[in-house]
């Protein structure tokens, strides 16, 4: 479909939308068609029938539907016959609000032999046009209703005309017969065809109001700044919509782009640009509808019963052949990917590969591999790894099962004796598995790997060495076929134990499956599989224990005997019979699962000591597995609901913000709706923060990918270099807008250029829709034509969900300054679909001095050293800001108002030589504080400005600029003005000082050579100072290290600072720095590179109180004390571990001996016979008591560190500190109660007193707290604590 939409309420029924099919049909861009009359007189030519044109105009005037065949001309001059279908769209009250004109090509006319061509069509024929591209346009009915109500509320009441707002001009179409007025306008074309077209004069009224200045319909718009004139023959169009008989009053057409208005200013050759016409007279019948401005009327007009459904679609039904980017343009997106030829199987390999060293895509390389060498990321290796994984899983399941259940079964033995090894299916499968494992070893010897430098190693020798140092031993042990080696020897138990060596391969599999730990579902599945596998192993062990005790047990109390009695299959006296293998395995698996998940149900219970001990171990393992699985499940669920929790938290903040500031309900609803939509679109993630976490080179590639559609399909960006596109992509910002969101308000500064990527927007002036824009449209203002940002002449509102790319004017101009060869192409190709700049709000903007001289040539702006905070001067007519003067070039400082800034002597681009001369001339002139609005006299110098030479266009700061803030007190021999010059460098870490502090007598900008020489001097002074400080510090620290070698710890040579003043060690001052002081030296010491100090030197603290080094006398006094033991000595560490083992022994055997051994008859008889020495535990307890007493003596001579982190070695202070601390606990735990109360007969009292040794566990727990940061150590300590508490409770239970 090819159609246009015109607003019936706007002057001349201007076009507010045209789809891509119409643009392709006529050859004009959307920017050239917007705001033109819907009669399409710009398509008329010599063969256009005047009668057909008059019929279209009559249909528009009469607001009636009509189909007309008419000959139109394309932009290249070719003619075609078209069927135009005029469809008026009415609101619920029957008033026409818009027209839809549909165009269907009937046939093409051959215009080769035609001598006459329309003057409107002078462009050369283009070869990329494809006639008849079918594209549709879809706009929902609520948008049309909203358009109706907005337009209805913008018309003045009454029937008299008047001057309306410039952006909201409406046209009155008289629908009833009336007497012709002398002020009425007639159509020349209709009057010329009176014999053919009959109709009253009131049906031929114009769509414009009288009194408009005479003007001709302009030709096709030219947005290029290099165009110098409009088409002088454009006024000779064959069909004009409205023209007065005196040719003195002709309505103008307001176009989307204002380039024609600007070009009409030049040289006085053309009349002044047209303005909006006055509002025409209102008909009494329509005033009731148009006067509806209240909310109730607007709601009443939103009914849809009387309006037909009209669908408009922005989506193309088939691709544009001329929009397809060439090969050079398509290479901008991910250029590195095209250099590789990976097929689909390799992509699948990267997903399925189990190798831990698979390279990421951007590091893949094509190494030179030897023959029969396999790449570790090849498809074959991926498939082989999965096959080995399946074999390992088979081994983990069937190896314990066969070792426990099958080796000693009578039927299995009889079958093996009859037909040999081949009769066992599992044995054959095991043999195949062993062969596969051996083949895997051979493959691993020829498989590449990635070394520490991320290089693919393919040399066979290096691969073999790497494999020998890694997994070779485990793989070799797991691949030994023990069944064949020991087959027939009769030692089935040995075979079963040796076959379990295959389980070692599970370690390697666990390492490879660790990559899936980031997926919640995968972790849960692996945990459940691990739980089931451990239960299977424990079931095999449980059966092995019962089977081992079954032949030697006469009491028949084992779990197998109980199982046989329960199911009616008891064992006979010879040990035969009993339950089947299936019954045994299922019962064992049931017991292990019930013990792992709970305490069991009692129907299968342990009876023998071996079974009970194993049950204890099962319950201990079960508690750990139960906690780990449910802990991970809780974490997975929490992770799943983390987004919901964040949403509710952020929503609560929004509501608290609304409540605190008492925001009214309409604005509150907008806030909540926007928050909900933004959250659904981004899930609460700051995409910009995520992007900034990557390096700049990767950011550029990502931005290039995000903006690939815009850069490929937008005409101005075609032909740009990759570097230019990367720079532009970094500057673009993506904006998402929901329906009804206002992107730009009327009167806002136009600081950016917008490119629509998806969706549709409407532009309103007041409540009148003046344009509807869609995909690939551009709106904003032509930045190259204006030195200052203008103000918007309307509101920009989203009709659907929209994605827009915007770039700020400063960013765009900065990139174009860096790529001047692309700048000319960009400005000449840029076609802004709708120009939002309001020229009426800026007096004299189109014909002002800002454009008059600057339009004749391309503007050159030097923005490389311009700060983002340096704004342009205020616009004329506004109150000037009485703030700091702007430093740099601006429109207000280039000349007087009324003088073209381009004609200023300093306006043109200057060479580096002229820049230097100019800088030298300015260096002696004073800097003046000039307000923004005050003009500068022509002869007055511009003062201190930022560097704008062509050679200084880099966007980076000077390497020394970061240090200026730290050494500003030292290098004060430069003037303040020079320091401020370098504070003007962009994006420097040092904040720019306020310009109000600049003295009026400050010198201007220094020449560039002088600046560079002073920078070199500053660099030399910094290097000299750093070298001297490093040498002095190294010397001092070497002297101190000679004394610190006597004391092991690093903090032993550090004492607290005294109350005296800081050290004032003399330092040689540097001659060019007269202001070098100790305070400034302390500042310099903050950035001295301590990495250059000698190795082993202690690191001096820079925060907090300064510590002074201990004196040699203190060190000597420290070493003069005899028999001191320091806490960091190796002997002290060994002694502490020995005491720890003794404490653990005490914690285990003291409750056991107190509960089980003291009142046993055999123990009492043995003690009565040979005395105390006959009890082994008693002897060990005596040795433990002696060791604890020795530990008390050692603690009296062990140094400690006080609260000031000083090493205390005085014996008296050590004794006082020990008496206040652990002495009482250590003394009670070291008392030998066995010897003191031996022979008294009070065994219960001895047992209770011996438990006092457990007090040492408190001290041990304090020392073991340092291992709390290691997860495995904490888990091991928790398990040991659990077992120890169970042991104590068992002793108490006894």
From Swiss-Prot:
Keywords: Cell membrane, Coiled coil, Ion channel, Ion transport, Membrane, Methylation, Phosphoprotein, Potassium, Potassium channel, Potassium transport, Transmembrane, Transmembrane helix, Transport, Voltage-gated channel
Intramembrane segments: 586-606
Transmembrane segments: 378-398, 425-445, 470-490, 495-515, 522-542, 613-633
Ranges of Basic residues composition bias in the record: 857-866
Modified residues (Omega-N-methylarginine): 987
Coiled-coil ranges from the UniProt annotation: 1008-1035
Stretches assigned to the Cytoplasmic side: 1-377, 446-469, 516-521, 634-1294
Domain PAS: 15-44
Residues bearing PTM Phosphoserine: 212, 216, 257-258, 294, 325, 845, 848, 1110
Domain annotation PAC: ranges: 66-118
Main location: membrane
Catalytic reaction equation(s): K(+)(in) = K(+)(out)
SUPFAM superfamilies membership: cAMP-binding domain-like (SSF51206), PYP-like sensor domain (PAS domain) (SSF55785), Voltage-gated potassium channels (SSF81324)
Entry superkingdom: Eukaryota
Composition bias, Polar residues: 232-243
Membrane side Extracellular: residue ranges: 399-424, 491-494, 543-585, 607-612
Biological role stated in the UniProt entry: Pore-forming (alpha) subunit of voltage-gated inwardly rectifying potassium channel. Characterized by unusual gating kinetics by producing relatively small outward currents during membrane depolarization and large inward currents during subsequent repolarization which reflect a rapid inactivation during depolarization and quick recovery from inactivation but slow deactivation (closing) during repolarization. Channel properties are modulated by cAMP and subunit assembly.
Domains as described in the record: The S4-S5 linker acts as a signal integrator where it both couples voltage-sensor domain (VSD) movement to pore opening and closure, as well as providing a binding site for other domains that regulate activation and/or deactivation of the channel.
PANTHER family, sorted: POTASSIUM VOLTAGE-GATED CHANNEL SUBFAMILY H MEMBER 2 (PTHR10217:SF506), VOLTAGE AND LIGAND GATED POTASSIUM CHANNEL (PTHR10217)
Family assignment from sequence similarity: Belongs to the potassium channel family. H (Eag) (TC 1.A.1.20) subfamily. Kv11.1/KCNH2 sub-subfamily.
Protein name, per record: Voltage-gated inwardly rectifying potassium channel KCNH2
């Amino acid at each position: 479909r090819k159609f246009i939409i015109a607003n019936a309420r706007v002057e001349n029924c201007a076009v507010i939308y045209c789809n891509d099919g119409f643009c392709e049909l006529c050859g004009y861009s959307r920017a050239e068609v917007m705001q033109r009359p819907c009669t399409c007189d710009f398509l008329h030519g010599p063969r256009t029938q005047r009668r057909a044109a008059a019929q279209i105009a009559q249909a528009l005037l009469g607001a009636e539907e009509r189909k007309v065949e008419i000959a139109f001309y394309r932009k290249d001059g070719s003619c075609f016959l078209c069927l135009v279908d005029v469809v008026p769209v009415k609101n619920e009250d029957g008033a026409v609000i818009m027209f839809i004109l549909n165009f269907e090509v009937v046939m093409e006319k051959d215009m080769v032999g035609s001598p006459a061509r329309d003057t409107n069509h002078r462009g050369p024929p283009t070869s990329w046009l494809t006639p008849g591209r079918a594209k549709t346009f879809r706009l929902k009915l609520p948008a049309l209703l909203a358009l109706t109500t907005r337009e209805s509320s913008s018309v003045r009441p009454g029937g008299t005309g008047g001057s309306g707002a410039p952006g909201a001009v409406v046209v009155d179409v008289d629908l009833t017969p009336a007497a012709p007025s002398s002020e009425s306008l007639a159509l020349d074309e209709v009057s010329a065809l009176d014999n053919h077209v009959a109709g009253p004069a009131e049906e031929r009224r114009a769509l414009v109001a009288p009194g408009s200045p005479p003007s001709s319909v302009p030709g096709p718009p030219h947005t290029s700044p290099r165009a110098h004139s409009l088409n002088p023959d454009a006024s000779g169009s064959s069909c004009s919509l409205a023209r007065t008989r005196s040719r003195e009053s002709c309505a103008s057409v307001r176009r989307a782009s204002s380039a024609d208005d600007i070009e009409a200013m030049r040289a006085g050759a053309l009349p002044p640009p047209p303005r909006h016409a006055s509002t025409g007279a209102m008909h009494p019948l329509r005033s009731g509808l148009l006067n509806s401005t209240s909310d109730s009327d607007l709601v009443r007009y939103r009914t849809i019963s009387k309006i037909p459904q009209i669908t408009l679609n922005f989506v193309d039904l088939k691709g544009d052949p001329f929009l397809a980017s060439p090969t050079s343009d398509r290479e901008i997106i991910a250029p590195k990917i095209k250099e590789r030829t990976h097929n689909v199987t390799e992509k699948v390999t990267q997903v399925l590969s189990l190798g831990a060293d698979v390279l990421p895509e951007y590091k893949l390389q094509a190494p030179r591999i030897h023959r029969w060498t396999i790449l570790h990321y090849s498809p074959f290796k991926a498939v082989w790894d999965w096959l080995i994984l399946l074999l390992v899983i088979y081994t983990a399941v069937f190896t314990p099962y066969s070792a426990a259940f099958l080796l000693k079964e009578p039927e299995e033995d009889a079958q093996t004796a009859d037909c040999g090894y081949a009769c066992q299916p599992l044995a054959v499968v095991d043999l195949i598995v062993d062969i596969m494992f051996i083949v895997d070893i051979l493959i691993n010897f020829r498989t590449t790997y990635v070394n520490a430098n991320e290089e693919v190693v393919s040399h066979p020798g290096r691969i073999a060495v790497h494999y020998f140092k890694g997994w070779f031993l485990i793989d070799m042990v797991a691949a030994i076929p023990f069944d064949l080696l020991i087959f027939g020897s009769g030692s089935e138990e040995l075979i079963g134990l040796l076959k379990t060596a295959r389980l070692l391969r599970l370690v390697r599999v666990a390492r490879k499956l660790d990559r899936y730990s980031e997926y919640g579902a995968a972790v849960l599945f692996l945990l459940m599989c691990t739980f089931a596998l451990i239960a299977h192993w424990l079931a095999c062990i449980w059966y092995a224990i019962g089977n081992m005790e079954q032949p030697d047990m006469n009491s028949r109390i084992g779990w197998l005997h109980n199982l046989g009695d329960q199911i009616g299959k008891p064992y006979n006296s010879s040990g035969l019979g009993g339950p089947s293998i299936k019954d045994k395995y299922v019962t064992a698996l049931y017991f292990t699962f019930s013990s792992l998940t709970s305490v069991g149900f009692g129907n299968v219970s342990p009876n023998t000591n071996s079974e009970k001990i194993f049950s204890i171990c099962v319950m201990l393992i079960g508690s750990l597995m139960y906690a780990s699985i449910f802990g991970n499940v809780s974490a997975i669920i929490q992770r799943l609901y983390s987004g919901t929790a964040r949403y509710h938290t952020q929503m609560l903040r929004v509501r608290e913000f609304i409540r605190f500031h008492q925001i009214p309900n309409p604005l509150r609803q907008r806030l909540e709706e926007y928050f909900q939509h933004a959250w659904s679109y981004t899930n609460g993630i700051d995409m910009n923060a995520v992007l900034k976490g990557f390096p700049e080179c990767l950011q550029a590639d990502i931005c290039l990918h995000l903006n690939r559609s815009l850069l490929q399909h937008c005409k101005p960006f075609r032909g740009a270099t990759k570097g230019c596109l990367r720079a532009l992509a970094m500057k673009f910002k993506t904006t998402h807008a929901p329906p009804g969101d206002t992107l730009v308000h009327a009167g806002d500064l136009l600081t950016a250029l917008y490119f629509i990527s998806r969706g549709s927007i409407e532009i309103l002036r007041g409540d009148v829709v003046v344009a509807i824009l869609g995909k690939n449209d551009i709106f904003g203002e032509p930045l190259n034509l204006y030195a200052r940002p203008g103000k918007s002449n309307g509101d920009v509102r989203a009709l659907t969900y929209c994605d827009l790319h915007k770039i700020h004017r400063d960013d765009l101009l900065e990139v174009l300054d860096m790529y001047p060869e692309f700048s000319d192409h960009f400005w000449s190709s840029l076609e802004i679909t709708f120009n939002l700049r309001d020229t009426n709000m800026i007096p004299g903007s189109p014909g002002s001095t800002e454009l008059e001289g600057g339009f004749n040539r391309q503007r050159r702006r030097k923005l490389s050293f311009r700060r983002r905070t340096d704004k342009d001067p205020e616009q004329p007519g506004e109150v000037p800001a009485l703030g700091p003067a702007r430093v740099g070039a601006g429109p207000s400082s280039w000349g007087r108002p009324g003088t073209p800034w381009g004609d200023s002597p300093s306006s043109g681009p200057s060479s580096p030589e002229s820049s230097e001369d100019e800088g030298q001339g300015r260096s002696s002139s004073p800097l003046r504080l000039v307000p923004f609005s005050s003009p500068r006299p022509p002869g007055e110098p511009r003062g201190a400005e930022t560097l704008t030479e062509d050679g200084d266009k880099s966007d980076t700061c000077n390497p020394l600029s970061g240090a200026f803030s730290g050494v500003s007190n030292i290098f004060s021999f430069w003037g303040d003005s020079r320091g401020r010059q370098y504070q003007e460098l962009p994006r420097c870490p040092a904040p720019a000082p306020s310009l109000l502090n600049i003295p009026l007598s400050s010198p201007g900008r220094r020449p560039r050579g002088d600046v560079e020489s002073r920078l070199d001097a500053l660099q030399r002074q910094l290097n000299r100072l750093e070298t001297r400080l490093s040498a002095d510090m190294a010397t001092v620290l070497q002297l101190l290290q000679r004394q610190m070698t006597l004391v092991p710890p690093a903090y032993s040579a550090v004492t607290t600072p005294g109350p005296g003043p800081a050290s004032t060690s003399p330092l040689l001052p540097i001659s060019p720095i007269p202001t070098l002081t100790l305070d400034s030296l302390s500042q310099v010491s903050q950035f001295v590179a301590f990495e250059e100090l000698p190795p082993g030197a202690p690191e001096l603290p820079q925060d907090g109180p300064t510590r002074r080094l201990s004196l040699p006398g203190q060190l000597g006094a420290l070493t003069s004390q005899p028999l001191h033991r320091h806490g960091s000595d190796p002997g002290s560490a060994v002694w502490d571990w020995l005491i720890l083992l003794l404490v653990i022994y005490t914690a285990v055997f003291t409750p056991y001996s107190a509960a089980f051994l003291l009142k046993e008859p055999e123990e009492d008889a043995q003690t009565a016979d040979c005395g105390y020495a006959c009890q082994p535990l008693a002897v060990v307890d005596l040795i433990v008591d002696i060791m604890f007493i020795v530990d008390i003596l050692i603690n009296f001579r062990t140094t400690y560190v006080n609260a000031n982190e000083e090493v205390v070695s005085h014996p008296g202070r050590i004794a006082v500190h020990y008496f206040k601390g652990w002495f009482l606990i250590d003394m009670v735990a070291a008392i030998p109660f066995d010897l003191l109360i031996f022979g008294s007969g009070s065994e219960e009292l001895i047992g209770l007193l011996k438990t006092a040794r457990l007090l040492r566990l408190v001290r041990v727990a304090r020392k073991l707290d340092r291992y709390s940061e290691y997860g495995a150590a904490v888990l091991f300590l928790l398990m040991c604590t659990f077992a120890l508490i169970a042991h104590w409770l068992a002793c108490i239970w006894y």
